[in-house]
Design a protein with these regions (language model features):
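N-terminal amphipathic/hydrophobic targeting modules at extreme N-termini
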Residues: 1-5, 9, 24, 354
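Membrane-embedded alpha-helical bundles of multi-pass transporters/translocases
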Residues: 13-574
Length: 574
């Protein structure tokens, strides 16, 4: 349910402005820091957000377990969440940032007017979508054939749809701040949502043991939290939106470029979001209507259900666990590097800099370092999550209505997702590289191919594997998509996306990750042989072993990425 400045001689300390090209502003912004500095800032704030998110999920799991109310609530929250990713954190911000960056360099006042127009357009579009969505829900509610789970899902959808324009506005305003070198407010805003949901769930459980009533209180809290998030981001962004003055004639060109990029991006991201939508819909409609049944009826046909009641909730809670390392590290790095890539792509190489690639050396260096850091973080995260999935699931969720059997179900799904945490991280970075080059069509075509593969695998694997088959399908499609993006980016740049130093770094990262598998993987068995079966103890021991083993392996292999991260500083050349 849920949402990243250094001496000018450093090629990675990318300035968003060229002081020689325009008069000095009365209130100049500080010199920009490296994307790695921003990435660590965002990672820290995202970690706080994800930790409060895990606390929220622990409360929800204790209240609802893997039951029909949890399924209905998460399906109801799916629509606004999908549109948040589509408009707020996806297509609009990806189309907006490169054009806003260019306009800000040339004319800050025009950039402010451009941002205001985009905000107004986003509000209008999402407002219309809410009205249409509420009308559709009302019409669906008139049908008498819904089960209790279906009726609750429609109710929660109706309550939470107004969150859609609020959270999209929050994500867009965060994008404005990113271009101005402020990554903190956007990364920290989800904490408000998490705290509001925790408070509502606690209140609902304390005042009523009726699960549907408690879920309704949480749904209302989601909308109220969205209002708070938007108010905070607007207050933080207002000086960048009010500096432009009247008149919009000088924004026509960037608006046109944004609109031309937005179409393919919307299609590409909409196609990609279909993966999450179809996963949830399959889990919802192919599950029995209540826990005491084993069959389900669809389109008039009754058959043995391939998944159990609570499949939607199980998917959501498993996704939270793999999204924690992905959001804290992978997406944080991709978010921070995007403005740097956009600025580098806008800077054409000089005659002396031109080589085999039409892009500036700064763009290629930034991309290569991003790839190395992404792998250095995400590959061991994949291995670690796979190894700690069972004690982690038990520690986070197993209490109240969430049983041992529920832990086993969610952990099995986490295993499928964990196989491709590194691929998800690469997808975010590589897609942003294409967007920085004003190419939205290639990611669209790649997304179409990946979705087709994912849907095919969903229908094939859900029957023998159940809900874990949906996670495994997503992981396989993500690996396929990451390799396709690498291939097409290599062709587009007319130069090596994975030069020798990057390939050598990737190989050493994989070796270091394999080296942590032995101590981390053997610890549970060793502790259990000593009669120590506490999930908390096993998880703590595995985490400590991993935190010691991987840096030790990286040091033994002389990997500079560890130093980059610890010092929050990148070298001038790789």
């Amino acid at each position: 349910m849920d949402s990243i400045r250094g001496p000018p001689t450093d090629t990675l300390y990318l300035s968003m402005q060229d002081p020689a090209s325009k008069p000095e502003l009365s209130n100049p912004e500080p010199a920009p820091k490296s994307f790695l500095h921003h990435a660590t800032t965002v990672a820290a704030l995202t970690a706080a957000s994800r930790l409060t998110g895990l606390a929220r999920d622990a409360v929800l799991a204790a209240a609802f377990g893997l039951g029909l109310v949890a399924d209905a609530f998460f399906l109801g929250f799916l629509i606004p969440n999908l549109f948040r990713r589509l408009f707020g954190e996806g297509a609009l911000t990806a189309a907006f940032i490169p054009n806003y960056t260019n306009l800000k360099q040339a004319d800050p006042a025009a950039a402010a007017r451009f941002a205001k127009l985009c905000v107004a357009g986003l509000a209008a579009v999402t407002g219309v979508l809410v009205i249409l969505g509420e009308l559709a829900v009302f019409l669906l509610m008139q049908h008498d054939g819904w089960s209790e789970k279906g009726q609750l899902a429609l109710l929660y959808t109706a309550v939470m749809l107004p969150y859609l324009p609020l959270v999209c506005g929050v994500a867009f305003l965060a994008a404005v701040l990113q271009v101005h070198g402020r990554f903190g407010p956007g990364a920290a805003a989800p904490v408000l949502l998490n705290l509001a949901m925790i408070a509502a769930a606690t209140l609902g459980i304390a005042t009523s043991r009726d699960q549907p009533h408690a879920a309704t209180l949480i749904a209302v809290a989601v909308v109220l939290a969205g209002l708070g998030q938007l108010a905070w981001l607007f207050f933080t962004t207002r000086k960048h939106l009010t500096a432009g003055g009247p008149g919009f004639a000088d924004t026509k060109a960037p608006l046109k470029k944004t609109a031309l990029m937005l179409g393919p991006m919307l299609l590409g991201l909409a196609v990609f979001q279909l993966n999450a939508l179809f996963d949830a819909l399959l889990a919802f409609f192919l599950a029995p209507p209540s826990p005491d049944q084993t069959t389900t009826t669809l389109a008039g046909y009754t058959f043995e259900a391939p998944v159990q009641t609570g499949a939607v909730a199980a998917l959501q809670w498993a996704q939270r666990l793999y999204q924690f390392p992905l959001g804290v590290f992978g997406i944080a790095l991709a978010t921070a590097i995007f403005p740097a890539l956009a600025a580098a792509a806008a800077k054409k190489p000089t005659l002396s800099e031109r080589g085999s690639s039409p892009q500036s050396p700064t763009f290629l260096t930034t991309l290569h370092q991003g790839l190395r850091l992404t792998a250095f973080i995400a590959v061991p995260a994949s291995v670690g999550l796979l190894l700690v999935r069972e004690p982690l699931t038990a520690v986070i969720y197993q209490r109240g209505q969430f049983t041992d059997a529920d832990t086993a179900r969610v952990a099995a799904i986490v295993a499928g997702y964990a196989l491709a945490v590194w691929a998800y991280a690469f997808m975010h970075l590589l897609t942003r590289a294409f967007y920085a080059l004003h190419d939205a069509k290639t990611p669209l075509r790649v997304s179409l191919a990946a979705v087709a593969l994912n849907l095919t695998l969903n229908l094939l694997l859900i029957w023998p594997l159940g809900t874990p088959g949906l996670a495994l399908s997503t992981a396989i499609a993500a690996v396929f998509q990451a390799f396709l993006l690498l291939y097409f980016l290599h062709r587009k740049l007319e130069g090596p996306v994975l030069p020798h130093d990057v390939r050598f770094s990737l190989a050493k990262t994989c070796l270091a990750s394999a080296m942590i598998a032995v101590p981390v993987g053997l610890l549970p068995t060793a502790l259990q042989m000593q009669g120590l079966e506490s999930s908390w103890l096993i998880l703590a021991a595995q985490v400590v072993a991993g935190l010691i083993a991987f840096p030790s392996a990286a040091t033994l292999l002389r990997m500079p990425e560890l130093t980059w991260l610890l010092k929050r500083h990148l070298p001038k050349t790789v």
